[in-house]
């Protein structure tokens, strides 16, 4: 027997804004949704609502990178038939495909665990703090001397494997892929761009697959109506479009230590709230 309650419109709007703001920042959108849900609404919206609302932020990626995506697709299609047309964009298309394979395999193997997964706040808080060390180390050792023409299939596979860490709430998809890119010598902006392109197939597949569960959660959580899911997706799109534009400009001039500090403050703060039993872990 599952304990399911309906989401309020206020909850939908707040969580959609949180989703849009945090999806592209290396701070974990799923972790923030779990934290905000528990602190403000005393209940987790659930992984399915997160996955569906992510469709809005991924549409934001499609809009922001629209010209790049069309150019890559065009180059990839031409390169399939004409060897002379195998440009850097052609190979980038293949690298996105290769980098998507790890999370597709893990998603299929662990689909039941992902669908029914509960997000304990102690896991979220611990991951926020622990993975901030990885991000800081990547920023410290990253040479940032490789350009897009120097990418290869091994790089794509490494970043793709790093993307699977995003299944752990509190890690962050962008945090894991940008860190992997920095370890490989890519500059911050290129690492972020490649990570965002890599996320498109996986997030769209996850979001579409999770739509039925968002209406009827299979574990304890909150259910949403079709209108609420639509509004949440639109809000996440608008806020996400602003966020991705801001982040890429920010990364040109600033390092990731700002986000490292933020993650530690939030993670430690949540652990303190759990220790004094101000909020429940689940």
Curated annotation (Swiss-Prot):
It comes from the Bacteria. GO terms for biological process: cell wall organization; peptidoglycan biosynthetic process; regulation of cell shape; response to antibiotic. The keyword Cell wall biogenesis/degradation applies. GO terms for cellular component: plasma membrane. InterPro entries: UppP (IPR003824). Its EC number is 3.6.1.27. Pfam families: BacA (PF02673). GO terms for molecular function: undecaprenyl-diphosphatase activity. It is found in: Cell membrane. Keywords: Antibiotic resistance, Cell membrane, Cell shape, Cell wall biogenesis/degradation, Hydrolase, Membrane, Peptidoglycan synthesis, Transmembrane, Transmembrane helix. Coiled coil: none annotated. It is a multi-pass membrane protein. The chain crosses the membrane at residues 90-110, 121-141, 165-185, 194-214, 228-248, 256-276. Bacitracin is thought to be involved in the inhibition of peptidoglycan synthesis by sequestering undecaprenyl diphosphate, thereby reducing the pool of lipid carrier available. Belongs to the UppP family. This is Undecaprenyl-diphosphatase. It comes from Mycobacterium leprae (strain TN). The lineage of its organism: Bacteria, Bacillati, Actinomycetota, Actinomycetes, Mycobacteriales.
